[in-house]
């Protein structure tokens, strides 16, 4: 028996062996690597480039890639299926992580943290499961603007570095739940 083992071992070393490659599984794994995530519009309004946001932190993409929306209404809905991972106490910003791992920050207005939550309301909490179109936050757009604040709303993919590409597929007016970004 030991002789059979030694002979088999020597023949394997001498001639090698080939693993059978399951072409179907190999193809399936490649498809999974190329998985895309659609991110839908969280607001109704006009889409603009982050470079057009009059705030250097957003315009420079220091926090990540994304887009901004000049809202026409005061409601923010979930752009993905996922989980609420952060809500600022002032309700001016919310973080969501999609089921595919895309981390999204929606920042309602510029310098609106200074309003200390005035004009904002929300019925969701950190840890809540959300679906595309679920209402996240409402805000009084007109009152915020009357206080002198810009309501332009950046939507940032904070873990942009983890993705090959983030493409905006809509460049003008958007409605709630319009497909807006494709992330690969």
How would you label these PLM feature ranges?
Residues 3-184:
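Contiguous, well-folded functional domains in the mature portion of proteins
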């Amino acid at each position: 028996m030991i002789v059979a083992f030694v002979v088999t071992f020597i023949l394997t070393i001498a001639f090698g062996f080939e693993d059978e490659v399951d072409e179907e599984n190999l193809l399936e794994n490649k498809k999974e690597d190329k998985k895309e995530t659609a991110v839908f519009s969280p607001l109704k309004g006009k889409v603009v480039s982050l470079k057009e946001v009059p705030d250097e932190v957003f315009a420079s993409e220091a926090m990540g890639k994304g887009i901004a929306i000049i809202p026409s209404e005061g409601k923010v809905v979930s752009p993905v299926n996922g989980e609420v991972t952060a809500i600022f106490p002032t309700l001016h910003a919310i973080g969501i992580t999609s089921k595919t791992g895309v981390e999204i920050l929606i920042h309602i207005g510029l310098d609106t943290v200074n309003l200390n939550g005035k004009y904002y309301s929300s019925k969701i909490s950190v840890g809540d499961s959300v679906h595309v179109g679920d209402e996240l936050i409402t805000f009084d757009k007109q009152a915020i603007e009357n206080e002198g604040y810009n309501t332009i709303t950046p939507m940032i993919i904070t873990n942009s570095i983890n993705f090959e590409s983030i493409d905006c597929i809509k460049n003008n007016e958007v409605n709630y739940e319009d497909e807006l970004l494709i992330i690969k």
